[in-house]
Amino acid sequence: MGKSDRKLTEENSIENGVKPGKLTEEEMDAIDNSSQSKIVAIASMAKRLGLGLGSDLSQVEYPSSFIAPFSTLNFFSNNFANHFNILLRANKIENEMDRLIEVFKYSTTIHKIPEDCMKVPLNAVIGETQSLNFQTPDLNSPNDLISDNYLITEQVSELPPNTATCIYNKKEGVKALFNHESKIVFQITNVKTPTTGRKYVRFDKFDEEYDIEFPVLHSRFMRGFVEYCGEGSIKSNKSKCFVSTNYIAKPLIGGNYHAYEAKVYNGIDSKPIYKISGQWDGESKITNLKTNETKPFFKNITTTTNFTPTILNTDSSVVWGKIIQSVAQGKPINLAREKSKIIENQKTLNWAPSQFFLNLEMGVWEPKLLND
């Protein structure tokens, strides 16, 4: 049976041992030059690749018209830093319940939605890095800026794809660490991107860490939008207080985009103390379930953080420079050929982690700089 005859069946799924095929350069060029709609093009690619329910798309090469002008490495990482000042404020809060709620507030700001659900980021290559420092407004004194905040990220594994990102202020003793191992799973009418790996926030002052569980990102290309769905949580290693969150899928008719409902527990009572609800990319409200008092919780405003990059020879902007420029300008490019050149060049670097080391005891990639 040829590629063109393959059907979208569960027999072609990754769980049953059949990995996606590969598009030829001629097939990619034909898709890029076609006048057909993106939906039709996706169906055509799925058939040629032999995709089935559950197929892993993490290493699939796409035509350039389906590529976004950035890498998976920095797709999420900058968003982790944009509201870092919420954590710096939480570091001043002595009450453990109030501090937990502030960490939850930060967690609602780090979700990233691509502008075009029909395009995917470039797969980061091993050793790719990004390094930034930035200032952020002091939420306790809005006219002042807090300096010495840093973001470092590195692609520490290619198969499976694993990105390590850390945002920290060493002076304040505040750190957010994300080990982001993900895969892209074909679901026939949508694509989901589940992630594994430890993600946590640490306050040295309290010797406390909060583990964060992410919901799953769904790209609903048939409906034209992307959303997070499923359960999330935040738990402390010292306090019994925790947050349980449900990220709600938008119904076919009615409902809101990016809705969620969270419940805050003190770890003693089986009933929640607070309920927080709204839209994570918009406005939320918090209700005290004992008094039924409801008040505004948070308005997630898009911020523009002025990052100052430290450009290494492994920086994303260097690694992908030619491809990103061509894609951003809408120019056709032989993606497979250009990426092969990049991979071969990366191999000559004799890569060893430059920004992170594997903490075997904790099973996470930790930043070297904080352990020097």
Swiss-Prot record:
Pfam families to which the protein is assigned, alphabetical: Oxysterol_BP (PF01237)
MF terms in GO: sterol binding
GO cellular component: cytosol; membrane
Compositional bias ranges of the Basic and acidic residues kind: 1-10
Chain spans, region Disordered: 1-25
Family statement: Belongs to the OSBP family.
Entry protein name: Oxysterol-binding protein 3
Source organism per UniProt: Dictyostelium discoideum (Social amoeba)
Name of the gene encoding the protein in the UniProt record: osbC
